[in-house]
Amino acid sequence: MKTIIFVCHGSICRSPAAAFMARKYLKELGREDEFKILIRATSSEEIGNDVYPPMRRELIRRGIPLYPHAAQRIRQIDYDNADYIFYMDYENKYSLMRQIDDYKSILFPINKWTNSITEIEDPWYTGRYQLVCDEIEECLKDIFAKM
């Protein structure tokens, strides 16, 4: 079983959306037993908080099953046990590079195999939850097509 960690700044919008969408997509593909999906933050600002309400509403609107969630900051032990860590934007990447030893081998942008998307913007600032979920969905399809 491969361990994938989705990471964003606070772990209340993008990374939980990616994880919940990935779980649904993998179940549809019959591949849910191949992957352990985790959610982490690069900051400690939102530790313990659930998914941000506007993102929660967008996931519900899309029929994405929600799971219990309390934001956690990524730790070295998470990295040590991960096969892939997918970050949403370059701010996340630089935060991870400062926090994690030997980050290079498993740290990837979520859009690694998606040419049409440069970064996943933070909807907490932009309010564009639908667009963010559309982009995450496209990235996830490309990720799991390659794995």
Model-based region annotation:
Residues 15, 89-90:
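Helix N-cap/beta->alpha junction signal
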Residues 1-81, 145:
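Conserved active-site segments centered on acidic
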